[in-house]
């Protein structure tokens, strides 16, 4: 290479260096910075021929430094795979065996058909005893009138709780009770409200066939609050243990008078034996009687004014005792006097005894039963009482020791009081609870 070529080559190199100016100025043009030209190399041997090449492209920008690696997770020494696993904890002691599964008890729910004297008092007693009433049916009473009739009672006083109606329901102490106005029991939707036990209080559907309409519409059981011509009859404290839940869906709670007489007759017969007897009930007037004289084709005397007269009447209460105490079948009969009092009646049982006994021995036997097996059903008093003293008494029968008399040790007259409304309604509810207990 000639000296001229060497010079040209150096010029080219200098030009390339100027293109890559080391100064910090951002301009791409040749900058005014002074160029330091290196001295020409010493030529010992002629350099090889160098062909002129285009300037190389600028080097790519260096890649951004990689992000620092995340710090290794802080692992407990015993979590390293290399570390041996800790010994397993000892197994816990076996749990105690679970209690045997019990079928949950179905709650006793009650429906009432007929919101008359007994229907309303059955509702009161259910509220007092914590039994849930789910429905009341009465074709002649709407919910607003039900509130009035239940809240105010001329005989038993005003209901002490809260009573109102809301959305077509009767609400008693915040308990919502469905109300219906169905004339036919088959139309009452018992099945849609939990298949309750139904209390038949109308006095109309007394036979098994008639009361079966409630079963057809979903009632679980039916208790008729009157003597029935063919349904099994039960008096609490006397024969309720004969109830058979497998075959008896419709039963009768007998009459209020039978509920008074039967417990007393049971005690006397078991202790002394009853050869025969006559019963008279002096009975308060009821809703079937007339306030003033009126027509009564089947019972002419019964059509006379209830407030003005003592009215002789028939009753099947004494004969019904033979149904609940079979040993007394055919040994008792009786009659009634309807008198001008609104509530509380009294039974006079005059009987001949098989086993001679003094009157004091008889009273002691009744007193022992009232404190023992018949507690809550039969009561005993020696006080000088009158009828109004028993208004609101929940017992079926209250024996009046001072009112009875004996002709001799085999012939006696025994007296027992009863609230023919409230006492009877308590036994209706007791029978419902007993029947329900037999289903468990």
UniProtKB/Swiss-Prot annotation:
SUPFAM superfamilies: Glyceraldehyde-3-phosphate dehydrogenase-like, C-terminal domain, NAD(P)-binding Rossmann-fold domains. The record marks 283 as: Activates thiol group during catalysis. Its EC number is 1.2.1.12. Residues 40-75, 83-102 have a biased composition (Pro residues). One of its GO terms (cellular component) is cytoplasm. D-glyceraldehyde 3-phosphate binds at residues 255-257, 286, 315-316, 338. NAD(+) binds at residues 117-118, 138, 183, 205, 225, 420. The active site is at residue 256. It catalyses: D-glyceraldehyde 3-phosphate + phosphate + NAD(+) = (2R)-3-phospho-glyceroyl phosphate + NADH + H(+). Testis specific. Pathway: Carbohydrate degradation; glycolysis; pyruvate from D-glyceraldehyde 3-phosphate: step 1/5. The modification Phosphoserine is found at residue 358. GO terms for molecular function: glyceraldehyde-3-phosphate dehydrogenase (NAD+) (phosphorylating) activity; NAD binding; NADP binding. Its main location: cytoplasm. The keyword Oxidoreductase applies. GO terms for biological process: flagellated sperm motility; glucose metabolic process; glycolytic process; positive regulation of glycolytic process. Keywords: Cytoplasm, Glycolysis, NAD, Oxidoreductase, Phosphoprotein. Residues 40-106 are annotated as: Disordered. May play an important role in regulating the switch between different pathways for energy production during spermiogenesis and in the spermatozoon. Required for sperm motility and male fertility. The testis-specific N-terminal extension mediates tight association with the cytoskeletal fibrous sheath of the spermatozoa flagellum, possibly via interchain disulfide-bonding of Cys-33 with sheath components. Homotetramer. This is Glyceraldehyde-3-phosphate dehydrogenase, testis-specific. The gene is Gapdhs.
